[in-house]
C-alpha cells in the first residue's frame, strides 16, 4: 500500500474507531454491512455489531460514517472533515 493511502485511511479509520461512530460499509458485490469499527490493519477491518466480522479491505467499496467525523492526516494540515 502506498504512503498516501495510509495517510488517508489510517487517520480516518482510527477516528471512526476511537469515537465509536456507527458506519455502513458497502462491499464491491453490493452488500451493505453496518456496525462500528473495532480494529483494522493493512488488509482487514473488524466490524462489530451483534458479532464481530472480519472484512477484507479489497472487498470494500465505500465506508459511510453515520455522522460527521474530524480527523487529521498528520501532514500539518487543518483537520480534514469527512
Swiss-Prot record:
The record's annotation in Pfam families points to: Hfq
Residue limits of the Sm domain?
10-69
Q: Which UniProt keywords apply?
A: RNA-binding, Stress response
Give the record's GO CC terms: cytosol
User: Does this entry carry the keyword 4Fe-4S?
Assistant: no
User: In the UniProt record, does the keyword Magnesium occur?
Assistant: no
- InterPro entries under this entry? Hfq, LSM_dom_sf, Sm
Q: Which residues cross the membrane?
A: none
SUPFAM superfamilies xref list: Sm-like ribonucleoproteins (SSF50182)
- Which GO molecular function terms does the record list? RNA binding
Task: Look up the record and give one Gene Ontology term from the biological process aspect.
Answer: regulation of DNA-templated transcription
HAMAP family linked to this entry:
Hfq
**Function, as annotated:** RNA chaperone that binds small regulatory RNA (sRNAs) and mRNAs to facilitate mRNA translational regulation in response to envelope stress, environmental stress and changes in metabolite concentrations. Also binds with high specificity to tRNAs.
Q: Describe, as the record does, how this protein assembles with itself and its partners.
A: Homohexamer.
The UniProt entry, under PANTHER family, shows: RNA-BINDING PROTEIN HFQ (PTHR34772:SF1)
To which protein family does this belong? Belongs to the Hfq family.
What name does UniProt use for this protein?
RNA-binding protein Hfq
Origin species: Albidiferax ferrireducens (strain ATCC BAA-621 / DSM 15236 / T118)
Amino acid at each position: 500500500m502506498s504512503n498516501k493511502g495510509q495517510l488517508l485511511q489510517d487517520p480516518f479509520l482510527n477516528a471512526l474507531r476511537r469515537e465509536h461512530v456507527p458506519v455502513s460499509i458497502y462491499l464491491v458485490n453490493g452488500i451493505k454491512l453496518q456496525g462500528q469499527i473495532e480494529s483494522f490493519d493493512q488488509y482487514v477491518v473488524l466490524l462489530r455489531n451483534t458479532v464481530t466480522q472480519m472484512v477484507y479491505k479489497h472487498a470494500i467499496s465505500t465506508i459511510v460514517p453515520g455522522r460527521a467525523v474530524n480527523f487529521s492526516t498528520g501532514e500539518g494540515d487543518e483537520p480534514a472533515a469527512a
